[in-house]
Amino acid sequence: MSSTMKPHNEAMRMQRWTIVMLSLLVSLAGCTEADDLVGEEPVVTNEEPLVNSFPIWNGTDHANTTLDSSAFANRSYLAYFSAPWCAHCESTLDAYDSIIPNGSIAIFSMEGREEYANMSEWHNQTETNLNRTFDRPFILHPELAKEVRVQSIPHAVFVNAQGYAFHVEIGKETNLTYIQEVWSATETAFFSPENGWNNHINNG
């Protein structure tokens, strides 16, 4: 046998020994006392389906009207997050506006910088760019956007009548058929801890 094989065999034996020791350590992990090995029974967990309540909010819209989440109590609505500088978001807002009933959209600006704080200007700019009237509240609310963890816009949260975030749509969406399906599902969506959601959305 060549002398060059001997170091190789030694290395192989050390590797095997290391693997055996690691296996023993893993098997003992979490069992540091004798009591840990006695009387253990299977742990049964009843995990509830995940659901998030949409935060309670209040603010003043572009017409200086005070508005809060209680105005949408016991009915579905769309919380739409964007910013005045997001020109490409307008086509999505236009699509949502054509489907969602009057009084069922709240438009929030996530932009906290002072030069974008005028909601009346944003509202007028939207009407000019879309070439039509736009009767929805525009509300400055970067704090709510942070609470909802808005990172990309447009960011639309479909809130059901229980106040739960039923569906979140991020990015451009102009498929009116899909938006109608999501809205219809939101209006009939109900969450129970025992059964979860009664409706589900297939992403468009």
State each model region's role:
Residues 1-50, 204:
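Secretory targeting signatures
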Residues 58, 64, 74, 102, ...:
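N-linked glycosylation sites
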Residues 60, 135-142:
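Short acidic-hydrophobic, aromatic-tinged amphipathic segments that line or gate anion-handling sites
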Residues 67-90, 106-108:
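Short active-site neighborhood of thiol/selenol oxidoreductases, capturing the structured segment around
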Residues 73-77, 101-106, 134-136, 153, ...:
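Loop/turn elements at helix/coil->beta-strand transitions in domains of secreted/extracellular proteins
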Residues 90-129, 140-147, 197-201:
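Structural microenvironment flanking redox-active thiols in thiol-disulfide oxidoreductases
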Residues 140-187:
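Thiol/disulfide oxidoreductase modules built on the thioredoxin-like
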Residues 188-204:
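Short, low-complexity, Pro/Ser/Thr/Gly-rich segments in the mature regions of secreted, periplasmic
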